[in-house]
Amino acid sequence: MSIRSSSPAQSRTSSLVQRHPLACFFVLTYLAAWCLWAPLVLLRGTLPAAVAFILVLLGGWVPSTVAIVLVAIMHGRRGVRRLLGRLVKWRVGLRWYAVVLILPLLVPLGLGLSILFGGPAPTVDSSIIAVLVGFVFSIFPGSAVGEELGWRGFALPHLQDSRSALAAALILGPIWGSWHFPLFMIGSESRPLILFPAFMLSAIALSVLLTWIYNSTAGSLLLVVLLHATANLPITVLLGPLAIDAVQPYWIFTALLIITAAVVVGFTGPANLSRTQRKQTSEDIRPVPNPVPAT
């Protein structure tokens, strides 16, 4: 007979994670990602493009990596399997796929209104194939999967344990948005620092919409990832080429996003941000206990 034992250090780590899962997640996610992105800020313009790309990519995967590690500590392999299983939860109703495709149209709508009021029009050189490749990349290995196992898969359910879905979304939004700050400090023409205030507000509004999708689909991370990716794509393709001139259309897009989020809150109510499902809590990401055999 063998007895599994853990070292005192492992026991202390497990106890800390069990008692403070959110604090552990946020601290580790910020610390690891910002350490990876620090060279981009400190050595901006001098790093080889390939190195910079890899650092951005690795940092983008930190939230999901941290979530998997914490779930493994808290719930073991079965917990990790349950978390990953939400990435393939696709039977949620066609209307939610339609929502995921329609919401990103706010970006070209915002750009169109900006042009109508005298703003510049972008020169889009991307072919359809390039756009499709960019979309697939933004899902995996891009930031959508790399982020959402953490932000919506781990942090959101824990935030919803003791507060309404709206409150959880409004807390998570600024934390999620601020986490991107170093990427606005690296001097990229497609992500100028002047856009950061609008980006923060759009992150908060998008956090509400992603929470709505997540709760309404009973925790489908697949739909969350798809919305994250489809929202990023038109911003990159349409607003990225404008560089500093993207300020006006980005603010208009942000205003439209806030209005949409407000309509969703009014329609669903703040408690669950869903008319048909309850909010997802940390209980929903724990593995189901094995049935006790009858004696």
Located regions from the model:
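Juxtamembrane helix-entry segments on the extracytoplasmic side of multipass membrane proteins
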Residues: 122-137, 187-200, 251
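C-terminal membrane module of polytopic membrane proteins
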Residues: 217-295
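Alpha-helical transmembrane spans of integral membrane proteins, capturing the lipid-embedded, hydrophobic core
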Residues: 22, 26-30, 34, 57-64, ...
